[in-house]
């Protein structure tokens, strides 16, 4: 099945200009990361234009999206986890233990705190701690980048924030070292009887924490996630007597227990979180042929070594006036996201068959004589040479004498720039790399 693309509507107007500018900026940024040869000082990308000739698309298959398209980003994971963590904790507590908020119950159960609300009414929380609620947003939780500060970038401490406030740089170090937010002389006059009993038991268990929990022998090493556990004031006292009832995905944490770092050396990395597949998700494989007039304007500054090394730099203007492309594109639609990439020649042959097989099938269906093997082999060899089969370029520099350019390195500069354009395209748009558009 073939489809027509309204190239003008897709590439013209404010949206088309904004997309062209984003592509220009992206290519320019990638050139700033390239190691330049000695005779080139810098490369600048000035303009990008889609041209007027549209590509030819031929749909080959409808199928389920690749599994890689379902991987969740870190930002999506932390945002979803924070919202679910805050809402589930508050709703679960109010639903399963409404009687625990009564003052009489809190007074009578000063010894058993396994079901206590970590922030009862009248509890004077520390001004350096954040109560539960909207501040669990990950944008308000900067990761600790200083070695030796508990918290670090581990995700284990993140799940404990629902009971103990914030970890990392937003938790007082005194509370981390002593397991008590009032360990550094903070007043407990406003605490109720139950809270006084909790602080007394913390003092009684201090001998179990005599050894330092922060390893300062190697300041460059990443701190263990065990350092984040005492930062929540009631974890050891709430779960020391008996396990908390209700839904809890994490085991009870006792004082003095050593929790291994899940990302420490020797541990396998956790598999990525995957989005749930839905029936409306789909993916299209289409054969794309393009021989258009897309334009890309660049300038490269060439260094002259006469009369001394790097004596002066001359700008060389390069204009890409068109490309020839032949490949297989993948377009996947998943939950208001469109994922787009191209397949390498090997992957394309594995999914939709090689070009030689397609020619043989079409010839057999039409009862036409099959093409010669030489032509099929040459076409396959041309295709395996790269998705960008040809890049046309024009160069301008300084003055010309007798129709010839004076500088001798112009050809080298052209080959270098075109090789980088080809490399950027294949690294950023060929699977497993892909682009995601929100719609």
Curated annotation (Swiss-Prot):
GO terms for molecular function: lipid binding. It is a peripheral membrane protein. Residues 70-85 have a biased composition (Acidic residues). The keyword Chaperone does not apply. Residues 215-230 have a biased composition (Polar residues). The keyword Endoplasmic reticulum applies. Residues 231-240 have a biased composition (Low complexity). Residues 70-102, 184-274, 353-386 are annotated as: Disordered. PROSITE patterns: SMP. Keywords: Endoplasmic reticulum, Lipid transport, Lipid-binding, Membrane, Mitochondrion, Mitochondrion outer membrane, Transport. Residues 1-439 form the SMP-LTD domain. Residues 197-212, 247-261 have a biased composition (Basic and acidic residues). One of its GO terms (cellular component) is ERMES complex. GO terms for biological process: mitochondrial genome maintenance; mitochondrion-endoplasmic reticulum membrane tethering; phospholipid transport; protein insertion into mitochondrial outer membrane. It is found in: Mitochondrion outer membrane; Endoplasmic reticulum membrane. Component of the ER-mitochondria encounter structure (ERMES) or MDM complex, composed of mmm1, mdm10, mdm12 and mdm34. A mmm1 homodimer associates with one molecule of mdm12 on each side in a pairwise head-to-tail manner, and the SMP-LTD domains of mmm1 and mdm12 generate a continuous hydrophobic tunnel for phospholipid trafficking. HAMAP family: Mdm12. Component of the ERMES/MDM complex, which serves as a molecular tether to connect the endoplasmic reticulum (ER) and mitochondria. Components of this complex are involved in the control of mitochondrial shape and protein biogenesis, and function in nonvesicular lipid trafficking between the ER and mitochondria. Mdm12 is required for the interaction of the ER-resident membrane protein mmm1 and the outer mitochondrial membrane-resident beta-barrel protein mdm10. Belongs to the MDM12 family. The SMP-LTD domain is a barrel-like domain that can bind various types of glycerophospholipids in its interior and mediate their transfer between two adjacent bilayers. This is Mitochondrial distribution and morphology protein 12. It comes from Neosartorya fischeri (strain ATCC 1020 / DSM 3700 / CBS 544.65 / FGSC A1164 / JCM 1740 / NRRL 181 / WB 181) (Aspergillus fischerianus). The lineage of its organism: Eukaryota, Fungi, Dikarya, Ascomycota, Pezizomycotina.
């Amino acid at each position: 099945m073939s489809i027509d693309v309204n190239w003008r509507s897709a590439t013209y107007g404010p949206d088309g200009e904004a997309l062209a500018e984003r592509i220009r900026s992206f290519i320019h940024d990638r050139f700033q990361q390239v190691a330049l040869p000695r005779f080139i000082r810098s490369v600048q990308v000035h303009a990008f234009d889609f041209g007027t000739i549209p590509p030819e698309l031929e749909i080959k298959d409808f199928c389920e999206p690749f599994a890689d398209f379902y991987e969740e980003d870190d930002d999506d994971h932390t945002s979803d986890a924070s919202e679910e963590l805050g809402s589930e904790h508050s709703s679960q507590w109010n639903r399963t233990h409404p009687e625990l908020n009564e003052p009489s119950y809190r007074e009578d159960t000063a010894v058993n705190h396994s079901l206590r609300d970590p922030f009862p009414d009248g509890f004077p929380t520390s001004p350096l701690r954040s109560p539960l609620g909207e501040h669990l947003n990950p944008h308000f939780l900067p990761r600790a980048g200083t070695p030796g500060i508990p918290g670090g970038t581990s995700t284990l401490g993140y799940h404990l924030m629902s009971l103990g406030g914030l970890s990392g740089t937003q938790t007082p170090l005194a509370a981390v070292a002593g397991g008590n937010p009032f360990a550094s002389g903070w007043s407990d006059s406003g605490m109720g009887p139950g809270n006084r009993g909790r602080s007394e038991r913390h003092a009684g268990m201090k001998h179990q924490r005599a050894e330092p929990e922060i390893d300062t022998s190697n300041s460059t090493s990443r701190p263990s996630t065990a350092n984040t556990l005492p930062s929540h004031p009631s974890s050891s006292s709430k779960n020391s007597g008996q396990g908390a009832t209700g839904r809890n995905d994490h085991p009870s944490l006792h004082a003095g227990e050593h929790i291994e770092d899940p990302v420490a050396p020797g541990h396998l990395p956790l598999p990525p979180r995957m989005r749930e597949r839905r029936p409306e998700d789909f993916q299209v494989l289409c054969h794309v042929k393009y021989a258009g007039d897309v334009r890309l304007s660049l300038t490269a500054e060439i260094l002259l070594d006469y009369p001394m090394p790097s004596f002066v730099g001359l700008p060389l203007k390069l204009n890409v006036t068109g490309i020839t492309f032949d490949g297989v594109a993948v377009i996947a639609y998943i939950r208001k996201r469109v994922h787009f990439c191209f397949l390498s020649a090997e992957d394309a042959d594995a999914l939709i068959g090689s070009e030689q097989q397609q020619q043989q099938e079409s010839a057999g269906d039409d009862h036409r004589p099959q093409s010669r093997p030489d032509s099929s082999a040459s076409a396959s060899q041309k295709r395996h040479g790269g998705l960008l089969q040809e890049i046309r370029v024009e160069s301008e520099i300084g003055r010309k004498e007798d129709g010839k350019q004076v500088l001798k390195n112009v050809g080298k500069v052209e080959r270098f720039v075109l090789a980088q354009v080809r490399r950027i395209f294949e690294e950023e748009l060929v699977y497993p790399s892909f682009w995601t558009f929100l719609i």
